[in-house]
């Protein structure tokens, strides 16, 4: 049975009976065979029995939790079965060595900028202001300078959104709370992507807490933030363009009663359905010479980092080629 992501938008409870997980809510009880679960996204209020947690942990299922506003609040990250002392040591070495860390951070920023430019090109927009930020990368002597170049590129990138989007006005980036519908979708989509990246890291030898562009923190898996930078334009932003310009998401899918503008429950259902379809979408991989899903591209990026840390192959960032 092919494993898939489950998005639980409504409030409910997860229980276990034998080797099946059940999701119970006011609409009834829904069985979820354990061997069909890749990851769970809890977008509503969710309670879980200890027996359910035990089975999910045994099967290596990550559970990602979001608050009522759609913001990521944490993950249940099962005990790692692929842990490698050598890889963790090499990860730590590359973080502690300022030159090695700067090399990886620069690669993440370069990949993010090139992907933003590629997305603009696909949308028939001028990418020259975004590309101009690349010239600052080679001379950057610190993480702060690299993040400044990335921020400049992203600001230039965002100025094109109002030319791409037909039915909503973007203006500028705003967070917590989002000031308009587009910002609400960006924040929600980025949270989903961060969680998807974390799920892929779990299935590799990488330690999710050791990062290079973003500063490690006690309360976040910052390597997922590093890798997510590469995929935000390709997965989240292109999805938003598609949803808006095809009239799939409309003003009725948002709620302004909670302060700011947020996706309603129905809006979240639409978004996660299409987000998951985007993860499952396939492209022909140039090096592997076969079709791989967007979700698999994230895993492959993790493997590239493992190869870099173990001196098998120097890391180069994912850049959209199609």
Curated annotation (Swiss-Prot):
| Functional summary from the UniProt entry | CRISPR (clustered regularly interspaced short palindromic repeat), is an adaptive immune system that provides protection against mobile genetic elements (viruses, transposable elements and conjugative plasmids). CRISPR clusters contain spacers, sequences complementary to antecedent mobile elements, and target invading nucleic acids. CRISPR clusters are transcribed and processed into CRISPR RNA (crRNA). Acts as a dsDNA endonuclease. Involved in the integration of spacer DNA into the CRISPR cassette.
Give the family per the record.
Belongs to the CRISPR-associated endonuclease Cas1 family.
User: Species name for this entry?
Assistant: Archaeoglobus fulgidus (strain ATCC 49558 / DSM 4304 / JCM 9628 / NBRC 100126 / VC-16)
Q: What is this protein called?
A: CRISPR-associated endonuclease Cas1 2
Under PANTHER family, the record lists:
CRISPR-ASSOCIATED ENDONUCLEASE CAS1
In the UniProt record, does the keyword Cell cycle occur? no
Record keywords? Antiviral defense, DNA-binding, Endonuclease, Hydrolase, Magnesium, Manganese, Metal-binding, Nuclease
EC number of this enzyme: 3.1.-.-
Q: Per UniProt, what is the name of the gene that codes for the protein in this document? A: cas1-2
- Asked if the keyword Hydrolase belongs to this entry, the reply reads yes
Taxonomic classification: Archaea, Methanobacteriati, Methanobacteriota, Archaeoglobi, Archaeoglobales
Cofactor(s) it depends on: Mg(2+); Mn(2+)
Assembly state and interactors? Answer: Homodimer, forms a heterotetramer with a Cas2 homodimer.
**A single Gene Ontology molecular function, please?**
metal ion binding
Q: Name one GO biological process term.
A: maintenance of CRISPR repeat elements
